[in-house]
Amino acid sequence: MWPQPYLPPHPMMLEESRQNKLAAAKKKLKEYQQRKSPGIPAGAKTKKKKTDSSPETTTSGGCHSPGDSQYQELAVALESSSVTISQLNENIESLKQQKKQVEHQLEEAKKTNNEIHKAQMERLETINILTLEKADLKTTLYHTKRAARHFEEESKDLAGRLQYSLQRIQELERALCAVSTQQQEEDRSSSCREAVLQRWLQQTIKERALLNAHVTQVTESLKQVQLERDEYAKHIKGERARWQERMWKMSVEARTLKEEKKRDIHRIQELERSLSELKNQMAEPPSLAPPAVTSVVEQLQDEAKHLRQEVEGLEGKLQSQVENNQALSLLSKEQKQRLQEQEEMLREQEAQRVREQERLCEQNERLREQQKTLQEQGERLRKQEQRLRKQEERLRKEEERLQKQEKRLWDQEERLWKKEERLQKQEERLALSQNHKLDKQLAEPQCSFEDLNNEKKSALQLEQQVKELQEKLDEEHLEAASHQNQQLETQLSLVALPGEGDGGQHLDSEEEEAPRPTPNIPEDLESREATSSFMDLPKEKADGTEQVERRELGFVQPSGVTDGMRESFTVYESQGAVPNTRHQEMEDVIRLAQKEEEMKVKLLELQELVLPLVGNHEGHGKFLIAAQNPADEPTPGAPAPQELGAAGEQDVFYEVSLDNNVEPAPGAAREGSPHDNPTVQQIVQLSPVMQDT
């Protein structure tokens, strides 16, 4: 708050107070004269008052007295004092006029101070505006820096994605190189696949070139953005330093103006105090004695001179203040010009900032377009990855199914082992019972024919039970083999040509229509032992089948699962697409083949144990039939019931052999004794079931 100036009293009030003071002074003089001259009449006093110019006064009696001389002296003194008072009044009026002039000058100075105050307020407002603009610039700088960081992070993420995509492309190229090497080894029938792969390779190479060009463009744009950001930061730092210097100068100037203003106010207050003291001195009544009036007048004259000197000093001070105010006005004008220049600079800077923002917006749009393109490429790569993952999941599911099938096969093997053990026990029991019966028959040759009929019935029942078991086992194995073949076909259709991204489905449809090429041995296998075992499997199986056909005269080679496995192997080999990750499946298949061979060996051992017993039993039965009932021999035209059953079983046997695409041995027609025996036929019917497991 500015200090309130001391307001002078109204001039009419001053004149009234002066007149009152003069009247009071006159009354006091009259009282004093009455006290000093009590014998003087009142009329003389009035006459003396009226005669101002007469130097001599007369009494009522016409004689002079010393009181009259004193009275005359007093009158002269009063006249001189009145003259001096009139002069003083004139001086006072002149001082009043000077005071009015001074007040007018003070009012002008106040007006100038008010204008300076307004200018300072405007400067403060401009300073506040500049501070707000500075804060806005800081916020824009922060946002630009944040956006630049965000773009840098996004560029890093995109660079990482590009690196991952490049690595993926390299892996795909490696896979394609492997596939191309495999395709070079294949026959001319795979020309369509090679053309498709070449197209896909060209597409991948084009995409890679586009990605490399896009990466170079993104790196160049990032470098440009970083350079522009550095230049913008430098420019903002320089502007900040300039604004700080300008603010410091403005604050210094404001401080100096405030100090000068305080000094002016202090001076004005001192002048007002001196004027009030002068007024008080002028207002004091002349209570001095008549001889001291001259001294009072002299003092008043001295004071008037002193006041004139002070007034002159005040005039000089006012002139100096006016000059200072003029200088301040010039400074304010210069500052206004500077502020206008600064405003123009700020406008230019705002225009530059708007241009830079437009450039940044354009760059952002470009980066967004680049991001869109990169996102599209990333989506394509993701789709390819998803397809590969789906294929991997399918392969895993197939592996799980194969594992489940292996478990089922193990369970079936365990069941068959248990059945074999039961059959062995039954055979042992039958052998023991037959031996006991033969001993009894040898001991008692007069046995009835009913026992033989019972034996025949029991044999027929056993044959029927064995047939039912065989049918059930055949149905189960056929279902398992068909299910396994379907799974292997689906697996082969999925595994065909691994590494093909978008063209995989189209190739699957073409592969179903195209004929399958000849099987070839895969070169991707790591170990040579696996390949050698893989090559030796069909030879060993062929040798085993020949030996079984020669020895057993009716054994059928195991089909079903083994044929499905062979077909899967041939398809794998023909396509040349057995990956390195499938060696475990190959080893599992080889183990299954080894187990099948072990089962064959065990069946051969069982047959070797059972055949002599059956031969002995057959010869003994023929001897008993010829001895006891020679008339009951069947006619050559009508076959015996055992032979009919054997013939039916033989038809079934040949049907199974035709379904399994295995020709019977050449010695099967020559040796007919095993076919005549039902127990041998039961064993022959059980042996392929055991071999199929």
UniProtKB/Swiss-Prot annotation:
Record's compositionally biased regions (Polar residues): 54-69, 676-693
Transmembrane segments: none
Protein name: Golgin subfamily A member 6A
Gene Ontology biological-process annotations: Golgi organization
Residue runs in coiled coils: 14-611
Basic and acidic residues bias locations: 537-547
InterPro entries recorded: GOLGA_cons_dom (IPR043976), Golgin_A (IPR024858)
Record-level GO cellular component terms: cis-Golgi network; Golgi cis cisterna; Golgi cisterna membrane
Domain of life: Eukaryota
Underlying gene: GOLGA6A
Keyword NAD: no
Keyword Coiled coil: yes
Signal sequence bounds: none
Tissue specificity: Highly expressed in seminiferous tubes in testis. Highly expressed in spermatids, barely detectable in late pachytene spermatocytes, and not detectable in spermatogonia. Detected at intermediate levels in pancreas and lymph nodes, and at much lower levels in spleen, peripheral blood leukocytes, skeletal muscle, liver, lung, placenta, brain and heart.
Pfam family, one: GOLGA2L5
Family: Belongs to the GOLGA6 family.
Sorted UniProt keywords: Coiled coil
Region (Disordered): 20-69, 497-547, 661-693
